[in-house]
């Protein structure tokens, strides 16, 4: 139950939390940009404007798989660390936070 173990657990839980937010942000951005592209098409907008919005949509869409992969790697690392250190850190705030992050992200990879 060293301070280094607690710090490592806290950092990895923070990484998972940040990547989850990032994934949610990109998913919301894709939904927003998809709606914008459709709105431009429905309005008969200039093809250049439509193409520009499609490029923005493509960039956001391209970030989803990468972010999901990084989240899965961080999730697996955090899971392994919790299994390794769980008994020694039982009841600690860091362990509780790590377990909360695992529970929040686990449905994505189940």
Give the residues covered by each predicted segment.
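Short, charge-rich amphipathic alpha-helices with coiled-coil/heptad character
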Residues: 1-14
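Amphipathic alpha-helical coiled-coil segments
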Residues: 56-77
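Long amphipathic alpha-helical coiled-coil segments
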Residues: 70-93
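A structural signal for well-ordered alpha-helices, especially hydrophobic packing surfaces
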Residues: 20-23, 61-64, 68, 82, ...
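C-terminal helix/juxtamembrane-tail motif
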Residues: 1-3, 96-110
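Short, charged, amphipathic alpha-helical segments
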Residues: 49-58, 92, 96
């Amino acid at each position: 139950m060293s301070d280094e173990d607690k710090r490592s657990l806290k950092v990895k839980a923070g990484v998972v939390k940040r990547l989850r937010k990032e994934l949610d942000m990109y998913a919301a951005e894709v939904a927003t940009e998809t709606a914008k592209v459709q709105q431009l098409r429905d309005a008969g907008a200039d093809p250049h404007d439509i193409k520009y919005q499609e490029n923005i949509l493509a960039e956001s869409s391209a970030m989803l798989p990468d972010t999901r992969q990084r989240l899965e790697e961080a999730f697996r690392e955090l899971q392994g660390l919790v299994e390794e250190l769980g008994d020694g850190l039982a009841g600690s705030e860091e362990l509780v936070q790590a377990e909360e992050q695992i529970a929040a992200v686990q449905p994505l990879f189940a």
